[in-house]
Amino acid sequence: MPRPYEIVAPLTVYEVLRRMRRLHRQDVEHFLHRLVDRPALSGDFEAPADDGRIHQVKIVGGWIVSYWIDHAACEVRVTSLEFIE
């Protein structure tokens, strides 16, 4: 049985999630659950990051979720969660 993927994110991402309105938080959490189930799921576009990796970027409601997949560790690395202004 393959090892399940897990979400890994900096504390700042969890703080943003905690402060979100319930409906927005549910939308983002639903996307993250889908991503854990299907880590090959692509974002809306890709963007280079300072660490040299190409990050997937997904627009969820009014929020931008940036992430990359560490297949070796079975982790979804969420790097940022920002409101679109």
Feature-to-residue mapping (PLM):
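Arg/Lys-rich, positively charged N-terminal/basic patches that mediate binding to nucleic acids
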Residues: M1-H33
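Basic/aromatic recognition patch in beta-strand/loop cores that engages polyanionic ligands
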Residues: D44-E85
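Short, charged/polar low-complexity linear motifs in solvent-exposed/disordered segments
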Residues: H33-L35, F83-I84
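Short proline/glycine- and basic residue-enriched helix-capping loop/turn segments at helix->loop/beta transitions
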Residues: V36-L41
